[in-house]
Regions:
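A glycine-rich beta-to-alpha transition motif near the start of alpha/beta enzyme domains, typified by
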Residues: 10-133, 183-330
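Feature of Fe-S/electron-transfer and energy-metabolism proteins
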Residues: 123-127, 133-137, 152, 156, ...
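Generic structural detector for well-ordered beta-strands
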Residues: 125, 140, 163-165, 276
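Membrane helix-loop-helix hairpins that form the core translocation module of multi-pass transporters
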Residues: 136-138, 142-144
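Active-site glycine-rich loop that binds ribose-phosphate moieties when present
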Residues: 146-148, 152-171
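Internal active-site segments that recognize and position negatively charged phosphoryl groups
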Residues: 162-192
Length: 330
């Protein structure tokens, strides 16, 4: 039986023929709907931004933190195009990239160990499982400590552990670009209400962040462990954000809060990942974590009407939730 959803309307049931495959997946609780556009001809002509808004809605849609589109470039390389719940396109998504890496790996799409996003190449590979039965993938993310995405300091300089006076007179932020812009601040304790207020405030400061920004607070729990919470540009507070966890781990390494070159556990409200920052002539941080496929299904989207059905429940989510519970008890 297929579910038919009109945007802003209640669920209705119809028996219809689905047009393309969808996969519900997540990385560390950061959940997505994924569409392989390279083989799903039924998706041709669908407006990706409108589809992302409809699908991501947790009341009238499937519910997700965005949509991952698997695409193929003319030179044969495959890429991830990620759209936020508000329909905007993100340059990069670390949790989403791991999910795409898994699908690409299983379907033989990965060329020279590379996937693309936002015009950049990212090395990806299957990694040692973080727990039994949990598919785990790694992506190496180059880090820039200067970027035109930040208008409050000269792009040739670094902004690490400094107060942005015109934004918040207390928190010491580090500004990093991972293909998408991030500001992160170390705190004694992550306060979600404070994070929400900061996230709402930062959306109004295009004078400081012309392209918007992802904002994170992180707390150092030991030399090898931090906890991160993020207000994502285009999504709000999520259970986790892969590039934000990477940015936080990188900032902590650059500031000497954690040791560069060592494996750091990065916990979040959705679970945990691992990061390792390499600092040399350039800065790269390796992000490792789960790529969980919750279910496979079929869908169509025409005239603003989303229809979908689940065809296979994988059972992987049960394994992830058991792992998540174990983390909570540590």
């Amino acid at each position: 039986m297929m579910l038919c959803i009109k945007i802003f309307c209640n669920f209705e049931r119809y028996i219809v023929m689905a047009d393309f495959e969808i996969i519900k997946c997540h990385g560390s609780g950061n959940d997505f709907v994924m569409v392989d556009t390279t083989r799903e001809k039924g998706f041709a002509g669908v407006d990706r931004s409108v589809f992302a808004r409809a699908v991501s809605d947790r009341v009238s849609g499937i519910g997700s933190d965005g949509v991952l589109y698997v695409v193929r470039h003319d030179d044969g390389h495959y890429a991830m195009d990620m759209y936020n719940p508000d329909g905007t396109q993100a340059e990069m998504c670390g949790n989403g990239m791991r999910c795409v890496a898994r699908l690409a790996d299983e379907r033989g799409y990965i060329v020279d160990g590379i996937l693309r996003s936002g015009g950049r190449d990212y090395p990806v590979e299957r990694a040692e499982s973080i727990a039994e039965g949990i598919a785990t993938y790694a992506v190496d993310i180059p880090i820039a400590v200067s970027s035109p995405d930040f208008a409050f300091f000269d792009s040739s300089e670094r902004w690490l552990g400094k107060v942005i006076e015109s934004f918040d007179k207390v928190l010491k932020f580090s500004a990093l670009s991972l293909g998408n812009p991030h500001i992160v601040a170390s705190v004694d304790r992550v306060d979600l209400e404070k994070l929400e207020a900061l996230g709402e405030a930062v959306k109004q400061r295009r004078d400081l962040f012309p392209n918007g920004v992802n904002l994170s607070l992180y707390e150092c729990r030991s030399e090898r462990e931090i906890f991160v919470a993020t207000y994502e540009r285009g999504a709000g507070i999520t259970l986790s954000c892969g590039t934000a966890m990477t940015a936080s781990a990188t900032a902590a390494a650059l500031l000497g809060i954690v040791e560069a070159g060592e494996r750091i556990e990065v916990k979040n409200r959705g679970g945990k990942v691992a990061c390792r920052t390499t600092i040399g002539d350039s800065i790269t941080t390796r992000l490792e974590g789960n790529a969980t496929f919750e279910w496979w299904g079929r869908a169509s989207f025409e005239g603003g009407v989303l229809k979908f059905e689940k065809s296979e429940i994988t059972g992987e989510e049960e394994l992830w939730q058991a792992f998540r519970q174990k983390i909570a008890e540590e």
